[in-house]
UniProtKB/Swiss-Prot annotation:
Keywords: Elongation factor, GTP-binding, Mitochondrion, Nucleotide-binding, Protein biosynthesis, Transit peptide. Residues 45-52 are annotated as: G1. This is Elongation factor Tu, mitochondrial. It comes from Dictyostelium discoideum (Social amoeba). This protein promotes the GTP-dependent binding of aminoacyl-tRNA to the A-site of ribosomes during protein biosynthesis.
Length: 424
């Protein structure tokens, strides 16, 4: 769901969405000034626990200080299906600043049917806000999002206990204990994870003059926790440029725009790149780069950008491919991976599987079917097992050693793994 990001000389506001990173362009465009370190964060958690409301509350609170543009719940949840069902389906990108950092914030879907979209969003985060409804406690997707956060490599979590205005004070301590136990169970330091207690809906209705403990004061505390508890990430700016493609659209007479988060390296306007994947393009020039509606002379690892590719048609670039420095990565169909298979209690399968099993593999932004071949020592792999096995994908996909992936079957997350060897 993307509308135009780049335009001709028209005084028109344009919006790019990965469901929606708002990127506007007018006849006179501003340049993005890097005055603060850039960090990618996001909201994860069970459906209806308040992720999108919290995202809106953060922008509302910070907008009164000139550090954000307020985005309402309706502006964040834009698609007709989302509006009709009142849930987030894809992952929304917005921006805001604290006193010391520039944040790109990804609001991830919590509904089970859209976990696959959450995987792509979570894989871009340097840290995440796990939103848990204090009256309800941790639920099915709370656990699944924690597991997926670990598997896609999110290094740090912050917990926001939401809806405190409707919570039983005697039960809040139990809910916090349950969440800490879940975090510890799945590889995070539950004892040391910071918790912020608040009510996002209350914060949305308040002003600075009427701020209360669970309202705006809780949002202020949350932003301070992000600044101090989410480590500044190391950016691989010295490696060859690589950006997984999230969304693609075309501008008549100008070319095709591909959007995504830069995984490594830097890119300057005018440089040539390659498109690697199902429809490879050996070389194409980048004639424009933007981030959150502002022009960039160059982009670097960690930034969510749109790249204007000269002369390409929209159908020549696909989600799941990568844009890279020419000659630095190839598309492959076969690899070995060290993989963990989730148990039923973790949201996985009830039964194991054997050679010939064909689930979906989520690798970067790609979603591709692959056939699993177990080693001769194993006739079957069971839930809870860890094993290295071979995967053969049905279409060429850009792969990297130590690259992470998730395995899905229907509405189940089957497992997750790390690529150990590329075989072709």
């Amino acid at each position: 769901m993307i509308s135009r990001l780049f335009a001709s000389n028209q005084n028109v506001k344009l919006v790019r969405t990965f469901k929606s990173t708002s990127i506007s362009m007018a006849a006179e465009k501003k340049k993005f000034e890097r005055t603060k370190p850039h960090v990618n964060v996001g909201t994860i958690g069970h459906v209806d626990h308040g992720k999108t409301t919290l995202t809106a509350a953060i922008t509302k609170t910070l907008s009164d200080r000139g550090l954000a543009n307020f985005k309402s719940y309706a502006q964040i949840d834009k698609s007709p299906e989302e509006k009709a069902r009142g849930i987030t389906i894809t992952a929304s990108h917005i921006e805001y600043e604290s006193a010391t950092r520039h944040y790109a914030h990804i609001d991830c879907p919590g509904h089970q049917h859209y976990i696959k979209n959450m995987i792509t969003g979570a894989a871009q985060m340097d840290g995440a806000i796990l939103v848990v409804s204090a009256p309800d406690g941790p639920q099915e997707q709370t656990r699944e999002h924690i597991i997926l956060s670990r598997e896609v490599g999110i290094p740090a979590l912050v917990v926001f206990l939401n809806k405190m205005d409707n919570a039983d004070p005697d039960l809040v301590e139990i809910v916090e204990m349950e969440v800490r136990e879940l975090l510890s169970q799945y590889g995070f330091n539950g004892d040391e994870t910071p918790f912020v207690k608040g009510a996002a809906a209350v914060a949305l209705a308040e002003t600075n003059e009427t701020a209360t403990q669970y309202g705006r004061k809780a949002i202020d505390e949350l932003v301070e926790v992000l600044d101090t508890k989410i480590p500044l990430p190391h950016r691989a700016v010295d490696k060859p440029f690589l950006m997984p493609v999230e969304e693609v659209f075309s501008i008549s007479g100008r070319g095709t725009v591909a959007t995504g988060r830069i995984e490594q390296g830097t890119l300057k306007v005018g440089e040539e790149v390659a498109i690697v994947g199902i429809k490879p393009v050996p070389k194409v020039a980048v004639t424009g780069i933007e981030m959150f509606g502002k022009l960039l002379d160059f982009a670097q690892a960690g930034e969510n950008v749109g790249c204007l590719l000269r002369g390409l048609k929209r159908e020549e670039v696909l989600r799941g491919e990568v844009i890279s420095k020419p000659g630095t990565i190839k598309a492959s169909t076969k690899f070995k991976a060290k993989t963990y298979v989730l148990t039923e209690a973790e949201g996985g399968r009830k039964k194991g599987f054997a050679t010939g099993y064909r689930p979906q593999f989520f690798i970067r932004t790609a979603n591709v079917t692959g056939m699993i071949e177990l080693p001769p020592t194993h006739a079957v792999i069971l839930p809870g097992d860890s094993l290295e096995f071979t995967v053969e994908l049905i279409s060429p996909t850009p792969l990297s050693i130590n690259g992470r992936f998730a395995i899905r079957e229907g509405q189940l997350t089957v497992g997750a793994g790390v690529i150990s060897e590329i075989l072709n």
